[in-house]
Every structure is written in structure tokens, then in C-alpha cells.
UniProtKB/Swiss-Prot annotation:
Species assigned in the record: Wolinella succinogenes (strain ATCC 29543 / DSM 1740 / CCUG 13145 / JCM 31913 / LMG 7466 / NCTC 11488 / FDC 602W) (Vibrio succinogenes)
Name the record gives this protein: Elongation factor Ts
Protein biosynthesis among keywords: yes
Family annotation (SUPFAM superfamilies): Elongation factor Ts (EF-Ts), dimerisation domain, UBA-like
Function: Associates with the EF-Tu.GDP complex and induces the exchange of GDP to GTP. It remains bound to the aminoacyl-tRNA.EF-Tu.GTP complex up to the GTP hydrolysis stage on the ribosome.
UniProt keyword annotations, A-Z: Cytoplasm, Elongation factor, Protein biosynthesis
PROSITE patterns, per database record: EF_TS_1, EF_TS_2
Compartment list: Cytoplasm
Gene3D superfamilies tied to this protein: 1.10.286.20, DNA helicase RuvA subunit, C-terminal domain, Elongation factor Ts, dimerisation domain
CC terms in the record's Gene Ontology section: cytoplasm
Family: Belongs to the EF-Ts family.
Length: 355
């Protein structure tokens, strides 16, 4: 029979969070085989893991997996309780294995993930084992997989700190455009990681939300204008509109007519109006879509060329390739967004863990 040393018992206890005597008994029953001892203690380990599930997991990592032919990409967020555990090698192995599992099975639902087999068991059981070994609550919070057909690609990017991940799918018409679209999608993913657009297009913004945001935005600009006025600096223009969704054909037609009347009043020759009006109308649209510039990917100015919006970048790339280029999918995960972490003092936290 193998010798059951104190060091072996300690190692098993650290792996499973089970009691000292339970660990010793498990090692005796399994003749000192620590892997079998972990299996022997699974139910006790699961009991410990269940207690850990009450604790908030708001740290962790965002992971991206992209197929070599850019036909498929997966994005997932796995949460732990502390940043320390998120840097643990065992946790990293869990993330890598889960990411590959999600990608290989093209999963977009955590419910489905928990029923998929890994290492000879359902993922839910595999996860509980890792919770017991690592010693913290771990949650696969959300997953998504994007798949494309011929004439489209999907690419992804995860920021070096593992806190932000983005997937973008682009559709094109000519096979020769593929490599350029792969590169463009990667660059746009990096833009989105930094600039935090919430949705792809203004069409996804709820009208009621826009109305509320307009009130808040105007109040913000008026407050800033008070300070600018005090400093003797130019004031912000207070917009009548803040989203492209508000710029109906009649609004744009009326604005164009207003611009022509202004040019007439200024004595500008009518022959040059058609050269001036488009630029002024474009400026009006830019000044009237402030919420789109903040919250929508297509409405934001590109970080690599701040003279163009992402929509204009796509249009320019399409002309360059003599093709039609369109973003068809956009997903962005930021670690812990929307998770409310409980406030707890140190003494309470220790008592909770002991109890």
C-alpha cells in the first residue's frame, strides 16, 4: 500500500476543498492515487462547489476562437470570483478547453453547453469538478458562435488583457475580396473593443430610448456650454436631432431647402449650389447623429481614420474592391458588464467562507 503522506493529503485538500480527514480517507481507499481520490471525493467536492455558487463571479476572462478559413468564430465569457484565479493555469486550461468545445460544436447557448460531453462526462459535471479543485465559483456566463456561408467571413479579436472580445461578420460579392475583408474585420473588431459601440446600427436603437437620451444629451451640452461661456470659448450647438432614425426624408428635404435659401440670401451663384449643398447636408447629418456616434458601430468615426465613419469606411473599401461590402454580424463581450458585485467587508467574507 502506498504511503499516505501529509503533503499528499494537503495537495488533495487544495485540489478539492474537502475536509482533511475526508482527504486522508479518500487516499487510503484509492491506494494513494490522487486522481482517483479526486473522483472519490467528487460528491463532497460538489457540495463545496455548491456553496461557492452563492458567491458572485465577476472577474474571469473573455475568449475568442476563429476558424482558420474564417467561416466560423466563437466568443465566450467565463467568470471567476477573483482576478488572481483568472490568472491561474488550471483556470486558463478550463477556458481553453471550454472555448474549443464551444467552437467545435458551434454552440450559442450555455444550456446546450452543459449537456455536451467533455473528458467522458457532461460539461456541467466537468465544470463542478473544476470549481471544487480551483476553489472559487466559476460561471460560463454567455457564449455565441457565428457561422458564415460562401461570400462572407467572420473574424474576431480579444484584447490582450482578456477583458474584451469582439466578433464581426462581413459579407462581400467577389471571392477576390475575401482576404481584404478578413483584414478589415480584424481592424473593425479592434476599433469596437476600444470604442464600445453597443449595437451595429441606429436601426437597433429603440425610439423611446432615443427620446430619453436626447433629453440627457441636451442637458449635458447645456451644462458644458455654461463652462465654455465662462471661459469665452465657442459653444456647442444644441441639436434638434440626435439619431439618423429621426432624419426622415422630409426632414432632410426641408434642411436641403433651408440650405439653398441661405445660399441665396448670401448671394452665392445658383450654379454652385449643387456643389456646396451636399457637403453642408453631410455636416448637418453628422451634427444630428451624436447618439449614433456614441453607441452604434456604423455611426462611429473610425479610430484609424477619424475623418470617416465606419459606414463610410465600408463604402470606401467597396469602391476600392469594386464590390459590395456589408457588416452582417457584430457581437461584443466585456468582462463583468452588468454584473453587480456584492459589497462585503473582510470579516464577513471570511465568516461566510468558514460557514
Amino acid at each position: 500500500m502506498a504511503e499516505i503522506t501529509a503533503q499528499l493529503v494537503k495537495q488533495l485538500r487544495e485540489m478539492t476543498d474537502a475536509g482533511m480527514m475526508d482527504c486522508k480517507k479518500a487516499l487510503v481507499e484509492t491506494d494513494g492515487d490522487i486522481e482517483k481520490a479526486v473522483e472519490y471525493l467528487r460528491e463532497k467536492g460538489l457540495s463545496k462547489a455548491a456553496k461557492k455558487a452563492d458567491r458572485v463571479a465577476s472577474e474571469g476572462v473573455v475568449s475568442v476562437e476563429v476558424a482558420s478559413d474564417f467561416s466560423k468564430a466563437s466568443l465566450l465569457e467565463i467568470n471567476s470570483e477573483t482576478d488572481f484565479v483568472a490568472k491561474n493555469e488550471q483556470f486558463k486550461e478550463l477556458v481553453a478547453k471550454t472555448s474549443k468545445l464551444v467552437h467545435d460544436h458551434a454552440l450559442s447557448s450555455t444550456e446546450t453547453l452543459h449537456t455536451v460531453s467533455v473528458d467522458g462526462m457532461e460539461f456541467s459535471e466537468y465544470l463542478q469538478q473544476n470549481i471544487a479543485k480551483i476553489g472559487e465559483n466559476i460561471v460560463v456566463r454567455r457564449i455565441v458562435t457565428l457561422e458564415t456561408k460562401r461570400g462572407a467571413i467572420v473574424n474576431g479579436y480579444v484584447h490582450s488583457n482578456g477583458r474584451v472580445g469582439v466578433l464581426i461578420g462581413i459579407k462581400f460579392g467577389k471571392e477576390g475580396s475575401k482576404s481584404a475583408c478578413v483584414e478589415l474585420a480584424r481592424n473593425l473588431c479592434m476599433h469596437a473593443a476600444a470604442m464600445k459601440p453597443q449595437v451595429l446600427s441606429y436601426e437597433e436603437l429603440d425610439p423611446e430610448f432615443i427620446t430619453k437620451e436626447k433629453v440627457a444629451l441636451i442637458a449635458e451640452l447645456e451644462k458644458e456650454n455654461e463652462e465654455l461661456k465662462r471661459l469665452g470659448k465657442p459653444l456647442h450647438r444644441i441639436p434638434e436631432y440626435i439619431s439618423r432614425s429621426e432624419l426622415t426624408p422630409s426632414v432632410l428635404k426641408n434642411q436641403e431647402q433651408k440650405l439653398r435659401e441661405e445660399l441665396k440670401a448670401q448671394g452665392k451663384p445658383e450654379a454652385i449650389w449643387d456643389k456646396i449643398v451636399p457637403g453642408q447636408l453631410e455636416r448637418f447629418i453628422a451634427d444630428s447623429t451624436l447618439i449614433d456616434q456614441r453607441l452604434t458601430l456604423l455611426g462611429q468615426f473610425y479610430v484609424m481614420d477619424d475623418k470617416k465613419t465606419i459606414a463610410q469606411v465600408l463604402e470606401a473599401k467597396g469602391k476600392e474592391l469594386d464590390d459590395s461590402i456589408e457588416i452582417v454580424d457584430y457581437v461584443r463581450f466585456e468582462l463583468g458588464e452588468g454584473i453587480e458585485k456584492k459589497a462585503c467587508n473582510f470579516a464577513e467574507e471570511v465568516a461566510a467562507q468558514l460557514g
